[in-house]
Structure formats: structure tokens, C-alpha cells
Amino acid sequence: MAADYQGLELTTDSAAAADAYSNCMRGYMGYQTDVGVHLKAALAADGEMAMALITRGYFFHLFSIPVLEKKAADSARAAREAIDARGASQRERWHLAALQAWNVGDMAAATDCWEQILLHHPHDVMAIRLSHFTHFYLHGGGAMRQSTNRILPAWDKERPDYGFILGISAFSHEEAGDYREAEAAGKGAVEINPKDIWATHAVAHVYEMQGRQNEGIAWLDSLSPQWAELNNFRFHTWWHKAMYHLEKGQFDTVLELYDGQFWAEPSDEYLDFTNAAAMLWRLDYQGVDVGQRWSILADVAERHNGDAILTFADAHYMMALAKDGRMEAAQTLLDSLAEAAKGSGEQARVAAAVGLPVCRATLALCQSDGDDAGAAADILLPLRDHIWRLGGSHAQRDVWAQMVCRALLDAGRFEDARGLLAQRTATKQNSPIGWRWYAEALEGCGDGAGAAAAREKAA
């Protein structure tokens, strides 16, 4: 028997395998690029190490690529065989159960396994990170905060990677709307480790949600030198910087960040793609000519047409296909989502309830015979309080909040738009875009004085 760097038992007699696995976990917590190298080293030292095999399966799932789903299942079988031959701790058996649940699309059952682990082993960083991930896509900020609140008392500054846990807590609080606690925790984590990009991004979310664009730009500028050696999550953090400049109307800067930072090269990573697609959609709403950028995204989207693994990603693939006029490919995506919606897992239910209608509305807005804003509004308006089921953060999902507001305005449904935009400007008072659109709605309702006041706030 051996132990990882948190003191948790690992079923292996190889010290080299245990050390490599610990390095893998450290790298995973820190968004390092050598995580896979360390995992391969662990398996090279002990090819039957159950936790290494299970972790390999987890990582295959995190890519959300169909060809890797089979490899995740293969990893689970190998781990099962290793456990049958060697035995395993209850913690490792729970991890195997989580992977097996994920293999059949039952992300909720997988999350339950990780939460069970954390009740007994609150220092299991893999269970912490993965439950954080699945709560993010399934249950939202409240569940994220509850999960981290359960484990946080077991951590202190003397324990390795305490700062990373503080960063996870920060983002959980932010998504639950507790911005004061989120900002304090995130800045505390960054003070411990300036390379903590998850904590950096948690604070960036606070600035985004509160409309503190100048502070957000300064925050990210001060920390961006720390990201050079980190994995592709750094692109998402650059995306946050672009969001501030977008709100300030600095569209040339947004395009510079798009081309030079978060979409410098086409990527098949779904997070990279969603950064790019959502930003182009927002730029289109501001009347910005994005050139051939949609076409490049549509090429990537076509490669993933039919994936139907993560509905959040599929909804962004539809943006690119529809905007670039690839209607046949867009219909193929709808068909694949409809087929996926017949399944039994959480993502099947999300696809049926939210993903399919959102994709249909997106397509309606881009039909070659003219934008059908009214049809899109009819689809999106009843869904506005259910979009959270797609997963993603408040900031990411805001593209669909913008979509329903813009569809209502373009369809001439100014009273409906007025209500939604009143709500929007009340919760995000420093949003010039929100105030401009609110002015448009008020003007359409015949409230010239109100429109003028809204435009003043947008200035």
C-alpha cells in the first residue's frame, strides 16, 4: 500500500506510481500542462493501479469527445479487473462506481459517489474537482457552494493545495451570488499562489457580474504573466478580459484578444470553442463585422456534429453552423440532439427540455430567408428561467439572455423586452449594453423620457 500527497491510501506497491499519481493530482489542481505525462508515468510504474486507471477514464470523459467515451469504458473495465485481483479501499471502489455511472451518462449518480467520498475523505482532490465540475453543469451555484462548504473546515493553510480549495470555494460562492465572499476567497487564494488561475477567474466573474469592467481589466492584466505555462483554461481567462472590453464598446480590443489569445488557433476543445462562438455572437449584436471568423468556427463545429455529449457545447456548435449558413449541418445537429434526447442520462433530459429548443431558436434567428426573431422569441421566452440547466456560468449563459432580449426587440415586442431589460439593468447597473437595449425597448413603448434617461446611463 502507498498514499498520495494528501495522505489518502492508494492500492499499489510502487512508490514511483504513487509519486507520479500525486504529481498528476497536483498538476490537475493547478491547470498544468503535464498532467497527462504524470498519469502515464504512474501507469508505466504500475499498469494495474486502480486509481490511475479510474483517473484516466475520468480524463477521457472531460474531453467530451465521442471517440474517447469508449476509452473511458475500457479504463473502467481495467480498473474493475485490477480491483478484483488486488482488492481496493472503499474510497477507490466509490471512485470506480462514479466512473461506471458516468460511462452510462448518469452524471448525477457519479456526483453522488464523489459526495459520498468527500463525507469520509474531504481531502480527496479528485472528488472535489469532479463534483465541482458536475454540480456546475447539473445543479448550479447553490449545490456548488454546499459541496465546498462541507469540505472547507477540513482544510487549513498548512495542508498542500489549500489555496486551490479556497479558489474552488470562491467560484462556488460567485455562482451562488455571494459576491463579497467570492471576491475575498478568490483574492486570498491568489495571494497564496498567483498562478491559481481558477481563483483568478472566480474574481473575474465577480467583476463581470457587478459591471466592474475597469477593475476586471486591471486584475487580469496584473496576473496574466502567471498563465504562460498553464493549460488551455488560460484562454477562457483571456475571454473574460474581452468581455470587459466588449461592455466598454472597445470592439477592436475584443477582436485583438480573440485573434491573439483565446482563438489564436482553431481548437477542438469544447471550452475554447464556446469562448469563441459566444463572443462572436455578442459582437454581432453590437454590429461588429467579424469577417470570416464564423466560417472557421463552423469548420470545427462540423467535426463535432453529432457529438451530443454535452448540450452546452452543442448549443454553441449550433451558433457557428447557423451563422455561417450551413443549414444542412445545422439540421444534422438538431437530429442528433433529438436522438440523444431519447436517452436516460441527465444530458438527455437537458437536451430534450432546453438544448433542442435553444438550438431551434438559434437556427430561426439565422435562416437564409430572413431572421425569424418572432419565432425565436416564442421559443426562448418561456425558457428564460430554465436556461441554467444547460450548465455553464452566469456569464457564459448570458449569451442566451441576450438572445431572448434581442429577439424580442427585433420582433417589435417592446413590452416583453422592457420587462426583461428592466430586470437586467437592475441586477447589472453598470452595463452600457443593457441600458442601450433598455432605451430601445422604452422608445418602442412610447416612453421617450425613460429612453433618454436610459441612454444617459449607457454613456
Language model regions located:
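Helix-coil-helix junctions within alpha-helical repeat/solenoid scaffolds
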Residues: 245-458
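Alpha-helical solenoid repeat scaffolds, predominantly canonical TPR units
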Residues: 20, 27, 37-39, 72-78, ...
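Internal metal/ion-chelating core segments
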Residues: 147-248
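Inter-helical turn/loop elements of alpha-helical hairpins
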Residues: 15-18, 23-40, 44-48, 53-89, ...
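Residue at a conserved register position within TPR or TPR-like alpha-solenoid repeats
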Residues: 27, 60, 101, 135-138, ...
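Canonical positions in the second alpha-helix
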Residues: 41-42, 79-82, 116-117, 151-155, ...
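Generic helix N-cap/helix-start motif at coil->alpha-helix transitions
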Residues: 15-20, 50, 88-94, 122-128, ...
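Single-residue signature of alpha-solenoid repeat helices
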Residues: 34-35, 72, 110, 144, ...
